Amino acid sequence: MSEESCLFCKIIAGEISGEFVHQDDHCVVIRDVNPQAPMHMLVIPRQHLESLDDASQKEEGLLGHLLRIGARIANLQDHDSYRTVINTGSGAGQSVFHLHVHVLAGRGMSWPPG
């Protein structure tokens, strides 16, 4: 998928409306449109990477930042228990091919996830 046709790139660029729960120089956070928990946020890097497989060593700092922002957002929503998920590839449930971290909270979660 090219950046020009990427849903998340269009949201980040303001071409498609989206309410940012958080934004900084490296990422934005939006609510998932199909939530799987009472709190379900997506932490999306501004840099277009199709999946975790496309991240190189130079993106290690960015990946850490995405996880820290996810934790901060969960804590600001008064959740001290939450799950972070990165789906990589369609077989793992990735439906938008722009790397993003799901942050889910507000209900009990079991293991394995499914």
Could you tell me what each predicted segment is?
Residues M1-G114:
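HIT superfamily nucleotide-processing domains
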